[in-house]
Regions:
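Short catalytic/metal-binding and nucleic-acid-binding patches
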Residues: 1-207
Length: 207
């Protein structure tokens, strides 16, 4: 899908198992996002390379609406939901932490039965796209090995948005932390991880 990138910023990304979402939904969301990106790019062209604040805000509101739409469909639990199994989740957990500290700063994630939410900050020259590819490749290799399968495990596309400010960051952290509960999952069906810094901030916050 079309993506906006800014060096040194945090991103909220969602990637999913290949059988978790109907192809027509993916194509519809892709077309909507592309139309919006063209609109913002044209606004930037007209305004000396930078879209006006209201256009940029509208684009980000659209992204959040897309994420909500995506989440509603994914939480229906379509497909085999391989990540419901602890050993498959552990393969993904290992992959998510493999590059922590040298390719990305991992801030939070929720592993759901058929999809994953990640909040992270790519480091140096590493891109979110390269991180997504690595996480998928490493976890797929291990899960396929356990199942004796081959072929595509993950959908190639991901859905992501740029974290725009501290308020947005806090809302994403809360969303990730509460996602399994919101989806009415049992503790054994999902996994949530928050950076120790976030955990400490949560403990220090007034109740």
């Amino acid at each position: 899908l079309p993506h906006w990138r800014m060096p040194g910023r945090c991103y909220f990304t969602t990637f999913r198992l290949r059988d978790s979402l109907p192809a027509e939904v993916v194509e519809e969301m892709k077309a909507e996002a592309l139309a919006w990106q063209k609109r913002v790019a044209e606004a930037a062209r007209v305004h000396a390379g930078k879209p006006p604040p209201e256009e940029w805000a509208a684009w980000q509101d659209f992204q959040q609406a897309q994420m909500r739409k995506l989440e509603m469909i994914l939480d229906e639990g379509r497909g085999e939901c391989l990540l419901r199994h602890p050993e498959h989740r552990q393969a993904l957990i290992n992959a998510l932490h493999h590059f922590e500290g040298h390719r990305c700063e991992m801030l939070a994630y929720a592993i759901m039965p058929n999809h994953v939410h990640v909040l992270c900050r790519p480091l140096g020259e590493h891109s979110l796209e390269s991180l997504n590819r690595s996480w998928k490749r490493h976890s797929a290799d291990r899960i396929h090995r356990r199942l004796g399968h081959s072929g595509s495990l993950w959908q190639e596309e991901s859905f992501d948005c740029l974290i725009r400010d501290a308020d947005h960051y806090g809302r994403v952290v809360r969303y990730i932390a509460k996602n399994p509960i919101s989806a009415h999952l049992q503790p054994a069906e999902a996994a949530v991880w928050l950076h120790p810094r976030i955990m400490e901030a949560n403990r220090a916050a007034p109740s």
